[in-house]
Amino acid sequence: MKSVITTTISARDAAGRFPSRSDLESVQGNIQRSAARLEAAEKISAGHEGVVKEAGDACFAKYTYLKTSGEAGDSQDKVNKCYRDIDHYMRLINYSLVVGGTGPLDEWGIAGAREVYRALNLPASAYIAAFAYTRDRVCVPRDMSAQAAVEFIGALDYVNSLS
């Protein structure tokens, strides 16, 4: 799984070189932020049902047309699938926080997502709205520490930047 550490080592190994000072500083920074990432991952794990529900509710509140006939949320089954997708991405964000890199999102979440959404007529903007709501809702210190929030928000923004 891709992380700052595995990416650094793989690149240097492919070049037949030792990691540079800059490489090691990057790895060290990643390790120093690990406690904050793990805190964010723990908080997400503990309350993911509520986070997913609020994100999905915000999405459907912003895009009310999604529940009209022929749209992505025109039946309870389709609405449930939207919540399932949000939950899936939250898990991938959680995994990315744990490993300290975007590997889980890149490998399991982003690849092909645009094509699937287009094929199923699912608007990416609705998912972006759900994650933007989650990002904007994070409250320090109610939800997590400031550094944990920075890590979590960074992961949410990463997902939104690729959509």
From Swiss-Prot:
PTM remark: Contains two covalently linked bilin chromophores.
CDD domains listed in its UniProt record: PE_alpha
GO terms under biological process: photosynthesis
Pfam family, one: Phycobilisome
Principal location listed in the UniProt entry: plastid
Cellular location(s): Plastid, Chloroplast thylakoid membrane
Annotated binding of (2R,3E)-phycoerythrobilin 1, by residue: C82
Signal peptide feature range: none
Primary role: Light-harvesting photosynthetic bile pigment-protein from the phycobiliprotein complex.
Protein name in the entry: R-phycoerythrin alpha chain
Naturally occurring in which organism (per UniProt): Aglaothamnion neglectum (Red alga)
Gene responsible for this protein: cpeA
